[in-house]
């Protein structure tokens, strides 16, 4: 049985940006900010507060896919980004895009999908034997989430329809033709403001010592042989 102990606890953004440096990236659900209004989404992108904004600075090329066609139109007109496609990640076979990528980024998206297996099946054609699929999703056994739930203070994401433990995520990947090669837990965005930075300074050493309880799962996979 595969050893599923996380290799460590890290910054999700730092890990992804390092892995995607000088590589050709396909970013699924690139807009992010799912609980924000349309204007807030576009403002975050224009102000370079999104992961996709940072990917454009370090990657050799980035292609973005998102189902929010209206937001994509606004981003093209207000921010000037190109290489964007409006598509449903659960229907990628309908997308007129015929190439492979070094990295397929599937970050904080799988928990939003009614049929995640359809998305994983559709991703296969964008990968070759050397491509990496990077998935992140909330950890079902995250310590802080479990504490908040016990205290009646937990709030689920507005569009979340499922959750994953490391075991469930591995099973999902295997069922759809992927082999998990690395597993970490992580925190999502870099801390902003002194209060967040203080909280991180206190919490990060604990989660580095016990990464099983980190808030977000971060898995790297390849096509199964």
Residue ranges and their predicted role:
Residues 6-24, 34, 45-51:
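Conserved alpha-helix/loop element of class I SAM-dependent methyltransferases that forms part
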Residues 94-104:
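A short acidic, Gly/Pro-enriched loop at the edge of an enzyme's catalytic core
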Residues 16, 55, 123:
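Class I S-adenosylmethionine-dependent transferase superfamily signal
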Residues 103-115:
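A short SAM/SAH-binding and catalytic strip from SAM-dependent methyltransferases
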Residues 28:
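Conserved beta-strand/loop positions that form the S-adenosyl-L-methionine
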Residues 31-92:
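Class I SAM-dependent methyltransferase SAM/SAH-binding core
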Residues 24, 45, 60-61, 132, ...:
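Residues at the starts of beta-strands that form the adenosine-phosphate
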Residues 2, 38, 67, 78, ...:
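S-adenosyl-L-methionine-dependent methyltransferase catalytic module, highlighting the catalytic core
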């Amino acid at each position: 049985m595969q050893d599923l102990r996380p290799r460590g606890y890290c910054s999700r953004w730092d890990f992804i940006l390092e892995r995607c440096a000088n590589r050709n990236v396909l970013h699924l659900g690139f807009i992010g900010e799912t609980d924000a209004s349309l204007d807030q989404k576009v403002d975050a992108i224009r102000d370079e507060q999104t992961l996709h904004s940072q990917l454009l600075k370090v990657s050799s090329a980035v292609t973005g896919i998102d189902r929010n066609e209206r937001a994509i139109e606004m981003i093209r007109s207000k921010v000037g980004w190109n290489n964007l496609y409006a598509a449903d990640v659960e229907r990628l076979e309908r997308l007129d895009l015929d190439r492979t990528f070094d990295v397929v980024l599937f970050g904080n998206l799988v928990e939003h999908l009614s049929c995640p297996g359809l998305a994983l099946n559709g991703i296969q054609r964008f990968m070759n034997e050397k491509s990496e699929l990077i998935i992140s999703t909330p950890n079902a056994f995250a310590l802080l989430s479990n504490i908040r739930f016990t205290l009646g203070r937990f709030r689920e994401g507005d569009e979340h329809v499922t959750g994953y433990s490391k075991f469930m995520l591995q099973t999902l990947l295997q069922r759809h033709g992927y082999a998990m090669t690395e597993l970490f837990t992580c925190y999502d965005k870099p801390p902003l403001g002194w209060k967040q930075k203080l909280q991180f300074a206190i919490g990060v050493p604990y989660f580095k010592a016990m990464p099983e309880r980190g808030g977000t799962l971060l898995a790297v996979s390849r096509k199964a042989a």
